[in-house]
């Protein structure tokens, strides 16, 4: 399994880091078989798997439950788990309780938190306690209401400079990596050059140290539309619908199950069951 040290070496050597979300045992198992470097159990599971309109309703219990499943499916892959909405915008003591629960109960190797400002002290607090933290700047979905929707961040010089400052503060606080979401590629490149920790981009262009995508977006599974920054490498959705539709048809027309899908009794047992009459 790759570790924080390996990711730093990959950045130094110019080897891109691959990260993919996973929310359950089978998706994690497939991600590990495909040799993904990191798995992110994102609170995006609230929208992708649980059907919420945002990530806000996701709880600490949800993150623990799903991370445990992912851990069972990917025993040899570095796993990062999101701290959900409001689980770290409380006192540092309460934050530690939530962080400890996620790490101890789920087996996550690192936690991800969004934003800067007061979150910088949270990163430092968790790091000092021995919990690796991945920072997340740019478009931060938990704060989408404050940001005015799902919009590109850092498009003007002033806000870009603020993001650069925040990125440096995250590194100084002890973050082991930084996710940059929906920022101009020029800004992402500049931040990547000024940090020693790896940057993982999602909608941040090519000049970052790694990329992350949502599992379901990548394979077109259960999604109606995807953001501009997503490339769909395959489409399993059409095949799944086709297979289920065929199942429905065959049941309705009594083509399924066939004899080969059924179990039988020995002839003498049948005779006994039916009282000698068949």
From Swiss-Prot:
Binding positions for Mg(2+) per the UniProt entry: 43, 82, 114
Protein name according to UniProt: 3-methyl-2-oxobutanoate hydroxymethyltransferase
Enzyme class: transferase
Cofactor binding note of this UniProt entry: Binds 1 Mg(2+) ion per subunit.
Protein's UniProt keywords contain Transferase: yes
HAMAP family assigned to the protein according to its UniProt record, in alphabetical order: PanB
Catalytic activity entry: 3-methyl-2-oxobutanoate + (6R)-5,10-methylene-5,6,7,8-tetrahydrofolate + H2O = 2-dehydropantoate + (6S)-5,6,7,8-tetrahydrofolate
Family: Belongs to the PanB family.
GO biological process, one term: pantothenate biosynthetic process
Record lineage: Bacteria, Bacillati, Bacillota, Bacilli, Bacillales
Residues bound to 3-methyl-2-oxobutanoate: 43-44, 82, 112
């Amino acid at each position: 399994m790759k570790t924080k040290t390996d990711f730093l070496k990959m950045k130094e050597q110019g080897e891109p880091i691959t990260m993919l979300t996973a929310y359950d045992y089978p998706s994690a198992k497939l991600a590990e078989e495909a040799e993904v470097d990191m798995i992110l159990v994102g609170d995006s599971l609230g929208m992708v798997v649980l059907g919420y309109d945002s990530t806000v309703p996701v709880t600490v219990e949800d993150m623990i439950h799903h991370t445990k499943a992912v851990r069972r499916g990917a025993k040899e892959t570095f796993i990062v788990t999101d701290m959900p909405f409001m689980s770290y915008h409380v006192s540092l003591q309460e934050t530690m309780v939530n962080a400890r629960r996620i790490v101890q109960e789920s087996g996550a190797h690192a936690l991800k938190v969004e934003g800067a400002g007061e979150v910088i002290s949270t990163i430092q607090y968790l790091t000092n306690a021995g919990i690796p933290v991945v920072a997340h700047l740019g478009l931060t979905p938990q704060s989408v209401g404050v940001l005015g929707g799902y919009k590109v961040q850092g498009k003007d010089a002033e806000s870009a400079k603020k993001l650069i400052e925040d990125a440096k503060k995250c590194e100084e606080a002890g973050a082991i990596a930084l996710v940059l979401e929906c920022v101009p590629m020029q800004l992402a490149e500049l931040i990547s050059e000024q940090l020693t920790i790896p940057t993982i981009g999602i909608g941040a262009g090519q000049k970052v140290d790694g990329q992350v995508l949502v599992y379901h977006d990548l394979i077109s599974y259960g999604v109606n539309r995807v953001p501009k920054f997503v490339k769909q490498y395959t489409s399993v959705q059409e095949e799944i619908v086709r297979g289920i539709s065929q199942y429905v048809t065959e049941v309705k027309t009594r083509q399924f199950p066939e004899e080969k899908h059924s179990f039988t009794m020995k002839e003498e047992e049948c005779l006994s069951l039916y009282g000698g009459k068949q």
